């Protein structure tokens, strides 16, 4: 179990985080948790009974807890796991919950999104990363931009809030790629304005994590990985100081343009809901 630290989430609810699985089935080129980097580690998934036991212990120790944040990537990995989530939280009607989901986990189980809402899922997080099909292919991000729209629309229409993660500054990324990502984020925002669910963004500059496919490509082509520096241009976002660091701009565009797209995509969160 994690150490149970209570935080106030952005809804103002008292929340505790748990982990129900380790390892990842996906192989994103930018991610240190990619399947190809962890061949000696099998995906480990806790049983439904184990998760229920931990939840009971949490509520016994902290009876005023209102929300559970599930940190792992694979909690909602297929239709069966969605059913399991609903069964777990049906036993704790006083709790709402939030968790990460991959687009492909829902695109094949789109009819189950309503079940998640009925099971008191408050918010889902999706790693969207890019709206450029060219860049999605380069970073091994499975699912298309159309899939992202389909899933996002279903989530929002069912009254579940959505947080989308975006990354700018991948190697060889151009202004055209930036624009496609911004347009995808904007389209989801427009959908949210007409639905019960709300949409917010969390935007990052690409970082070449050691050992990843993109890191190795950069080293091979340039021999240089830049050191960590504070990015003053994006430090304006309150509560994001731990994310306002960069390890160099590896895109095809200048820093000013890269920062411009990071900032305006992040600002979509501030627009009227």
Q: Where in this protein do the model-derived segments appear?
A:
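Short, solvent-exposed coil/turn elements at secondary-structure transition points
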Residues: 103, 168, 207-209
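Radical SAM [4Fe-4S] cluster-binding motif and immediate context
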Residues: 1-162, 170, 183
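A structural signal for short, well-ordered beta-strand segments
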Residues: 124, 164, 201-203
């Amino acid at each position: 179990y994690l150490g149970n630290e209570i935080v106030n989430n952005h809804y103002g609810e008292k929340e505790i985080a748990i982990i129900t699985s380790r390892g990842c089935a996906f192989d994103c080129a930018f991610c240190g948790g990619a399947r190809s980097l962890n061949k000696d580690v099998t995906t480990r998934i806790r049983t439904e009974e184990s998760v229920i036991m931990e939840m009971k212990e949490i509520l016994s120790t902290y009876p005023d807890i209102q929300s559970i944040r599930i940190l792992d990537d694979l909690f909602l990995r297929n239709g069966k796991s969605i059913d399991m989530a609903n069964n777990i939280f049906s036993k704790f009607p006083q709790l709402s919950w939030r968790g990460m989901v991959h687009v492909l986990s829902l695109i094949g189980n789109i009819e189950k999104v309503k079940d998640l809402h009925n099971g008191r899922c408050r918010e889902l997080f999706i790693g969207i990363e890019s709206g450029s099909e060219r860049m999605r292919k380069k970073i091994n991000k499975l699912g298309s931009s159309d899939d992202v729209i389909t899933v996002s629309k279903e989530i929002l229409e069912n009254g579940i809030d959505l947080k989308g993660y975006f990354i700018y500054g991948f190697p060889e990324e151009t202004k055209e790629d930036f624009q496609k990502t911004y347009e995808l984020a904007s389209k989801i925002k427009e959908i949210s304005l007409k639905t019960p669910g709300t949409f917010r963004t969390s935007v990052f500059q690409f970082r070449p994590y050691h050992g990843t496919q993109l890191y190795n490509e950069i080293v091979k082509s340039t021999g240089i990985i830049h050191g960590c520096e504070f990015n003053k241009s994006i430090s304006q976002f309150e509560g994001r100081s731990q994310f306002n660091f960069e390890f160099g701009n590896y895109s095809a565009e200048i820093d000013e343009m890269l920062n411009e797209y990071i900032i305006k995509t992040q600002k979509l969160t501030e627009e009227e809901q």
